[in-house]
Amino acid sequence: MRKSSCKMGTNSNTLVKLKNAGYQQNDKWLVKGVSLEVEKGKIVTLIGPNGSGKSTTAKIALGIYKKFDGEVEKYTNKIGYVPQKVSIDWTLPLRVRDFMVLTESLKEEAIDEALSLTGVVHLKHKNLGNLSGGEFQRVLLARAISKKPELLVLDEPVQGVDFTGEIALYELIKKISEELNCGILLISHDLHTVMSATDHVVCLNGHVCCSGSPSDVAKIMSIKLVG
């Protein structure tokens, strides 16, 4: 595997672009041949089964992997990230406000603004261990947008939430994209749930199976299932 560099530059709309990107571990490809582009104010969703390379693709875009195949062009360093798993000792008396500033300093105004946008400012002084799954996901989103990112990467941001909560969170994600004019790279397991909140879909299974608008991808997948 050759080392590929991330390029920085100026572009009116593009925030990150992957060109034939891939990553292998222990001589096994986790994902390969992925090309996609995330623009300001647009939501690109990666869907696919477990182990299909969704999280790996997101980490390539984020620059977490220093060695990968293909090319990544990034046009912003203002990036927010919600990982798939967050390690927290739930026995600690950690308030939402403390969690918001756990890894970096924030002004109180920025904390309140982010929590307000995600609808949980009333939980600011509540312990994390007392939050529901949906409330915690909203707090994670608030922390990710607290510094007004241009690019937001969300890895399964509705996990641990019931169906009604999922719909509400996807609506919130769309609202965040519109209000902050940020591009979003979203990982989801269910195309039908996320359809109304995304602009472009990339279906992965170790490689790109298909891509396009949500309706186009849904048609392709239904044809494959019927066929």
Could you say what each language-model-derived stretch is?
Residues 152-156:
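Catalytic Walker B motif of ABC-type/P-loop ATPase nucleotide-binding domains
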Residues 207-227:
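Conserved beta-strand-loop-alpha-helix hinge in the C-terminal portion
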Residues 108-123:
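Conserved ABC ATPase "signature" region
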Residues 127-131, 135:
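Conserved ABC ATPase signature
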Residues 148:
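Conserved catalytic motifs of ABC-family nucleotide-binding domains
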Residues 188-189:
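H-loop/switch region of ABC-family ATPase nucleotide-binding domains
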